[in-house]
Every structure is written in C-alpha cells, then in structure tokens.
C-alpha cells in the first residue's frame, strides 16, 4: 500500500491545487503510453515549479517510512510562552535521513497553535511562541503524512469502552471528571529508545511502542488494554514475533513520562497470554 501512502503525503507536500494540476499534466503528456517514476517526478516539477527531486528520493526511491517524534520540550515564560521543541528522527525499513516539512501542534482545551517546520536531521530544535498554555504537543496531529505512526484521537463524553482504531489499544473509561477529555493514542512502528542505564536485564521491543497524550479533566480516569501479537498470521501478526520467541510469562509493561526519564516497570498490570 505504499503507493497510496506516498500519494497522500504528496498532496500535503505540494498542496492540493498543485498536486491535481500536476496529475492532469502528467496524464495529458503521458497518457496512453509508458511512464516511470522519474518521469512522473519531472512532470510534477515542471507543472508546479517545485523541485520534487528530494521528495521522490525520500519517499519513492527509498524503501520504508520516516518517523518523527518530540524528544523533549523546554518552556520559557514571558509576554508569550516560548517553547523550545526538540525533535528526533528515526526510520522504518531503512537507515535513510529524510527532509520533510511537518506540522507541530501545541494543543490545549480551547485553541491550538500549529506551525510548519522542516525536519532534516536526526535531531532538530524549534522555537515556537504562543499566548496559549498547551496541554500536549504533537507532530502531524492531522495525519497529513503517511509516516511510521498510526494514531487515533477521541473526545471522551461518557464512561465505558472505547476502541482506538489502528493503534491496538482499547480504553475502558472509569470516571469522566469535571468535563469531557481528549485522548490521543499513537502507535509508533519503530523501536523505542533503549534504557539509559545498561544492566537492566530487560530487552525492549525492536518493533514498536505506544504513546498517550491529550487533555485530561481533573478526575478523569481510564484503564487501557495494549495488544501484542507474536504470531505469524498474515492478517494481524508479524508484530512481536521477533521479540516473543518463547513463553510470555516474563513480559512486562514499561513506562516513562518522557524521554528525560528512565523506563520503569508498571505495577498493577494484568498480563493476558494466549
């Protein structure tokens, strides 16, 4: 399905008007004949005036997908709130370094601040000033890119069970609190950071991890089920099959508030094997 993922990302990269104009030019000039990806790239460049070389090198001619995440945030108050946002770049299926414009959204209960930045290194830092006091900060909140993250965001209006599609997470909301809350689950399809200190004796997944953010009203409380799968099923497997190669009784759930902290084993967790 990478072709559809690339097309989705290309629309964001070029903007819809230029993207569809480029597709029309491509069909007019190459229709009913043979064409390749290089010619498609050149047609888009010619019609839009945007040099598409780097995009095609990153997304078409390189296997896999990029992964962009927020490593840490430093806030300095003033007339505006000044946020210094440190990002981290990883990749899925390659060791390629991408150059991509991405949106960073600083979200609170009432108003969001979204800015577009260019991530072009393993680590970057961006300064964003806003009058708001965001509850959480996310990259590509509105899913303009087909990167190595699948996510789902839901406004919680009642207690009970909620499925978070494409994340392998289910919520069971116990109490709402004073008002509605927003929960965002991201399923990251790259290996998490390792332990800061060696010698823990714990091996972390080499394939994926989750993050949870949102706006949580005082008193909001939920349980969550995180589904792992060590099978070789073509439909749902090949996720944890390299990680689970024996019994499952030693599996633990690790958590850290952010990248500044060490991973810790969560207690009060029920492991359901099978």
Protein language model regions, located:
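Short, intrinsically disordered, charge-balanced linker/junction segments flanking boundaries
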Residues: 1, 268-274
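Amphipathic alpha-helical substructures
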Residues: 1-85
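Beta-strand-rich interaction surfaces with strong enrichment in secreted/lumenal proteins
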Residues: 57, 115-117, 211-215
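Beta-strand-rich binding/interaction modules
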Residues: 66-69, 73-138, 251
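Short conserved micro-motifs at the rims of enzyme active sites and ligand-binding pockets
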Residues: 95-98, 148-151, 236-238, 265-267
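Surface-exposed loop/edge segments in extracytoplasmic proteins
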Residues: 109-117, 259-268
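Short acidic/polar inter-strand loop motif in beta-rich domains
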Residues: 141-153
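Self-processing/autoproteolytic domain segments and adjacent N-terminal interaction modules in large
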Residues: 157-266
């Amino acid at each position: 399905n990478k072709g559809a993922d690339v097309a989705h990302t290309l629309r964001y990269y070029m903007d819809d008007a230029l993207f569809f104009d480029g597709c029309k030019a491509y069909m007019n000039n190459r229709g009913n004949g043979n064409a390749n990806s290089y010619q498609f790239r050149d047609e888009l460049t010619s019609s839009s005036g945007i040099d598409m070389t780097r995009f095609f090198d990153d997304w078409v001619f390189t296997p896999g997908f990029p992964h962009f995440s927020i490593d840490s945030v430093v806030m300095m108050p003033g007339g505006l709130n000044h946020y210094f946002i440190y990002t981290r770049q990883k990749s899925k299926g390659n060791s390629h370094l991408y150059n991509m414009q991405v949106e960073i959204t600083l979200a609170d209960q009432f108003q969001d601040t979204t800015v577009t930045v260019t991530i072009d290194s393993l680590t970057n830092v961006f300064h964003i000033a806003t009058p708001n006091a965001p509850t959480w900060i996310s990259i590509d909140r509105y899913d303009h890119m087909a990167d190595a993250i699948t996510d789902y965001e839901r406004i919680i209006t009642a207690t009970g069970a909620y499925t978070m599609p494409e994340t392998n997470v289910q919520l069971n909301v116990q109490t709402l609190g004073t008002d509605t809350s927003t929960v965002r689950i991201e399923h990251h399809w790259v290996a998490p950071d390792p332990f800061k200190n060696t010698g823990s004796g714990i091996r972390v997944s080499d394939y994926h991890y989750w993050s949870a953010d949102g706006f949580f009203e005082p008193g909001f409380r939920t349980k969550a089920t995180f589904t792992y799968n060590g099978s070789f099923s073509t439909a749902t497997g090949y996720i944890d099959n390299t990680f689970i190669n024996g019994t499952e009784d030693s599996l633990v759930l690790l958590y850290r508030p952010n990248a500044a902290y060490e991973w810790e084993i969560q207690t009060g967790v029920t492991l359901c094997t099978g």
